[in-house]
A protein has these predicted regions:
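Non-catalytic terminal extensions of PLP-dependent enzymes
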Residues: 2-165, 173, 185, 264, ...
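Conserved PLP-enzyme active-site core in the AAT-like
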Residues: 9-10, 22-26, 39-57, 64-65, ...
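Conserved acidic residues
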Residues: 31-36, 75-82, 190, 215, ...
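Long, structured ligand/cofactor-binding scaffold of large enzymes
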Residues: 140-234, 240
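Conserved phosphate-coordination/catalytic loops
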Residues: 170-177, 196-197, 255-263, 511-514
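Alpha-helix N-cap/helix-start motif at coil-to-helix transitions, marked by capping-box chemistry
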Residues: 173-177, 396-399, 518
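A short linear hydrophobic-aromatic micro-motif
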Residues: 192-193, 350, 528-532
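Short glycine-rich or small-residue beta-strand-to-loop segments that form or flank ligand, phosphate
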Residues: 193, 286-289, 539-544
């Protein structure tokens, strides 16, 4: 790890000594700097203000000559003053080094600092892991290349909990505890738990800490499958499902406004647990997506005000957000910034740090904000939460993952965190403007007009602080979502959502020609740009502080190029050479528009957009026949049979089935195959056969080839004698 540098102004007199490398202040972004030396003229031209605005708290010294006076208003913002002259160069150098070393030390947050110090001790390891600092790998040419590729420091930092000097990650002692306490402070939680197996595990930790068989769980039908696993399959809680929106482009929307009305919720309870419909606080837990995969953001204050008095706790699954409290216009949607009292629910928030924050893959965190209900029967104390935590945590954690979570908290601390996210928002707005100015067919998913003026006509600085430019106003055609209330939802500014041709925004119907987004996604991947996901006529790009305008302009350039290829109806071999080469016999002679038309017609023929919508509407939910846990146990006992999709109609699903991404179950174990879900998977099956090279990833069903055709198969519960007529004969 390189030593940090000293940034020095060209106009500074030569008045200090240092062994550190020096860089010109005007050529530095301050990222790799431990101390800064300015002249009085630098301060007067605003350099000190510029440095303070970073929020990095780098020590700043001012160098003077000829008895220059420093304006009094700057004295409280600097670490010291150096005066030109040979006599004190060494003395000033020691002051400089003291400040630089202190900054360098405090820059490293608690766990990372302890990890670096421990590795630097050079201890001789006779414990796990067996590669012991990478030395085992170095015994073989392949292993040596492995170490060389990742660097020795990673292997030296892969430690075992056998040495208590690094504390304990499972019972939260020492540096790990201090790191999590620091993160809790940064994210405004009472307590934070670092989780090293993704938010799938974080959700299960929370759900296993709260839910028991028979508990009512208010359940967003948009929830990620991990919530089904934890709440329904593991805990055997009873779900009360809330219907959610899909729009014609394939975007995942939010829960309908009427679903938050108490009278409606009590009607739903009466359907599944009538004896509990009149309880004052019937729900042990509500599980709500704070932000959907496709960037529909909830207002946490509204959610708590509407349903909080009915719930012991609310889990806001924030896998796809977590940065909202660092963006001023999004702050009201943050559950961690709420002022709560003893009558409110406890708040739990899970965040996938690896998604859009700064973390290695699988890094996640749980935030607990419930001190306002401490002492009440419904309160979940730390020991109970940690018991569930240890059920899901490995006893061999990878320390660099934990360190990444520690660093993420440090990066978000104070002004610097807000600055990074504001830069991200600004870049995202400017990228949308570029697309609006340069593309004719591919459009950003934002309002066309705001107060009667085009979205892009407003100044970026205004858009970046005003939610009106991202709100879903009920009834506006551009978004085509139904069932929303005023100020209920808005588009996440840090998710660049684009739509492709094929949907008439005025009525949500299919047009004669369309461009399914998977074709655009494959074109981008062919040209070195990787989108997060696509579905029907929508495509998603995640924006983080990693983005700069050069990267975003590259994306826009490729979008423009794709449109030109579309307009010229270029040969498919030119547009998608990899897919064409793999399936040349199928696509011989095809053009881009020909492929688009064929796929678009498939969607229109099956009305896939409507099927997607219906799957998440209460009227079309698959009927529940068994408790999900019972269905899963039947699957584990082998009381199932594998059948072709058409033969699954009327049968009980043994597995949850879904396309991935987004990882949202369409049918839950114990529900009956049929209706919109069956027709949706049938449409996917036809697409797999008709259009090779574009098959989606499907989970919970199996694609097998028979007689030259790929078929979708699924496990269903074997009929029991007493139920055979019902289970085999029922058609939906």
């Amino acid at each position: 790890m390189s030593e940090l540098k000293i940034a020095v102004s060209r106009s500074c007199p030569d008045c200090f000594s240092t062994h550190r490398a020096c860089v010109n202040i005007d050529e530095s972004n301050y990222i790799d700097v431990a101390a800064i030396i300015l002249s009085v003229s630098d301060v007067e031209r605003g350099k000190l203000d510029e440095i303070d605005a970073t929020g990095y708290d780098i020590p700043v010294f001012i160098a003077t000559e000829n008895e220059e006076r420093i304006p009094a208003e700057y004295l409280s913002r600097i670490s010291g003053v150096f005066e030109h002259g040979e006599a004190r160069k060494e003395f000033y150098g020691r002051q400089l080094e003291t400040a630089a070393s202190h900054y360098e030390t405090q820059l490293r947050p608690p766990f990372f600092r302890a990890l670096v110090d421990y590795v630097n001790q050079g201890n001789s390891a006779f414990d796990c892991p067996g590669h012991q600092g990478g030395e085992f790998f170095r015994r073989h040419p392949a292993g040596n290349q492995f170490v060389e590729y990742f660097g020795e420091a990673l292997f030296r930092a892969d430690l075992c909990n056998a040495d208590v000097a690094m504390g304990d990650l499972l019972i939260h002692e020492g540096a790990p505890c201090i790191a999590q306490q620091h993160a809790a402070k940064v994210f405004n939680a009472d307590k934070t738990y670092f989780v090293l197996n993704g938010t799938s595990s974080s959700n299960k930790v929370v759900l296993n800490a709260l839910l028991t068989p028979g508990d009512l769980v208010l359940f967003d039908r948009n929830n990620h499958k991990s919530n089904h696993h934890g709440a329904l399959l593991q805990a055997s809680a009873t779900p009360v499902y809330l219907e959610t929106a899909r729009n014609p482009y394939g975007f995942i929307g939010g829960i309908d406004a009427h679903c938050f009305e108490e009278s409606y919720l009590r009607e739903l309870i009466a359907e599944v647990a009538p004896q509990r419909a009149k309880e004052a606080r019937p729900f042990r837990l509500a599980v709500i997506q704070l932000g959907t995969y496709d960037g529909t953001i909830y207002n946490a204050r509204q959610v708590v005000d509407k349903i909080g008095h009915l719930c012991d706790y609310i889990l806001f699954d924030s896998a796809w957000v977590g940065y909202e409290q660092f963006i001023p216009m999004m702050a009201d949607c943050s559950p961690l910034l709420l002022d709560l009292n003893e009558n409110d629910p406890g708040i739990l928030v899970t965040q996938s740090v690896h998604k859009q924050q700064a973390g290695f893959s699988q890094t996640s965190q749980i935030h607990k904000k419930d001190s306002h209900i401490k002492g009440q029967q419904r309160y979940v104390p730390h020991k109970r939460m940690n018991n569930a935590f240890m059920m899901h945590a490995s006893t061999s954690p990878f320390y660099p993952l934990f360190a990444a979570l520690d660093i993420n908290a440090k990066m978000h601390e104070g002004v610097s965190g807000r600055n990074m996210w504001m830069d991200c928002v600004v870049n995202g707005i400017n990228a949308r403007k570029l697309i609006l100015d340069n593309c004719q067919h591919i459009r950003p998913f934002v309002p066309e007009l705001v107060d009667g003026k085009p979205w892009q006509s407003y100044e970026t600085a205004q858009i970046a602080v005003d939610l009106r430019f991202f709100q879903f106003v009920p009834g506006e055609h551009w978004h085509s979502f139904e069932g929303y209330a005023e100020n209920q939802y808005f588009v996440d500014p840090c998710k660049l959502l684009l739509t492709t041709p094929g949907i008439d925004a005025r009525n949500g119907e299919y047009e004669a020609f369309g461009v399914p987004a998977t074709i655009l996604a494959n074109f981008l991947r062919e040209n070195g740009v990787v989108p997060e996901k696509c579905d029907l006529n929508s495509i998603l790009f995640l924006l983080t502080p990693a983005e700069d305008m050069a990267k975003l302009q590259q994306l826009v350039a490729l979008l423009v190029r794709f449109e030109k290829l579309l307009e010229s109806d270029a040969p498919l071999a030119e547009v998608l050479p990899s897919i064409y080469k793999q399936h040349e016999e199928r696509y011989a002679g095809y053009t881009l528009r020909q492929l688009c038309q064929e796929m678009h017609d498939l969607y229109a023929r099956h009305n896939v957009k409507q099927l997607q919508k219906e799957m998440f509407r209460k009227e079309h939910f698959p009927r529940v026949s068994m408790n999900p846990q019972e269905a899963n146990y039947a699957y584990l006992r082998g009381e199932v049979e594998l059948v072709r999709l058409p033969d699954a109609e009327g049968r009980i699903a043994a597995e949850g089935a879904l396309p991935y991404p987004p990882g949202v179950l369409c049918v839950v174990p114990g529900e009956i195959w049929g209706g919109a879900v069956l027709r949706y998977f049938s449409a996917l099956e036809e697409g797999i056969n008709l259009l090779p090279g574009f098959a989606p990833e499907l989970q919970g069903v199996y694609i097998e080839e028979h007689d030259g055709r790929k078929q979708v198969w699924c496990y269903v519960i074997k009929p029991r004698d007493a139920q055979s007529t019902l289970l085999k004969g029922e058609k939906l």
